[in-house]
Amino acid sequence: RHKEEVSYDKLLVASGGGGYLPEGLREFRPLMNGLGSYEDAVKMRQALPGKGHVIMLGGDMTGLDLARTLVAVGHEVTLVAGEQLFWPHEVGEKKEDKFVAVLEAMGVNVVLGKKVTAIRKGTKGKPARRVVFGGGGGIDGDAVMPFCGLMPSLNFMIGANVDIERGLLVNPELKTTNDSIWAAGDVCQIWSPEENSYLFYYGWHHIKEMGNIAGINMTGGKKKISTYQDDHLYINKQGEIDSPYWMYR
């Protein structure tokens, strides 16, 4: 932004990721609210009246975390579920039906099997937004929010002599293929010997660990991150869905 050049001996890339928006929804971006920054949150708060109605698209775990919070403070939430439902968890069809039932019991309205073909401004006297379904019909709400997974923010790294797949490829010590560059957080894929592939590790507990390990290794350490994952969606003692990705300690 400032067109500055800063030299470095070692670089940590922790640029994170932004919300992924499927191609079929991109033309409607101006009519949707994001949650990628503090400014986005302020705009969302301003757009939403008391006991307002939020329509969520997709249904990844970030969105569901917000959904349960909105319901808890008195708002109505309708989720138009897509293929990103419960992402990044991989949930089988039988378990998905069970988790959807629990989600509805938590107060979230879930719409299944509908393809969104348009988002429009509401007509006079109606809520501010209308989501239109293929084959007819739709739903009105005060705000529309897409939660369709994450896309690593790494375009600026092209040409930096690092290997890139969907994210920056790093070893378990979080070093890229460039000996001067490390990466941590949603921007990187870590080599997992257990899975014999590069994996993303989402959630605050993973990201916090990555930051600590990257700092240690950039100052001479050789610490490796644990690449074993047991991050399953589950139903807690209160009978609600819960996830390790919702751990913020």
Where are these regions (language model features)?
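Redox-cofactor binding/interface segments in oxidoreductases and associated redox assembly factors
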Residues: 13-14, 56, 133, 146, ...
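Glycine-rich dinucleotide-binding loop and its adjacent helix/turn
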Residues: 10-73, 170-172
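A Rossmann-like FAD-binding core segment of flavoenzymes
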Residues: 6, 73-172, 222
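Phosphate-coordination loops involved in phosphoryl transfer and adenosine-cofactor binding
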Residues: 1, 50-53, 113, 128
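FAD-site-proximal beta/loop scaffold in flavoenzymes
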Residues: 28-51, 138-213
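Mid-to-C-terminal Rossmann-like scaffold of FAD/NAD(P)H-dependent oxidoreductases
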Residues: 187-249
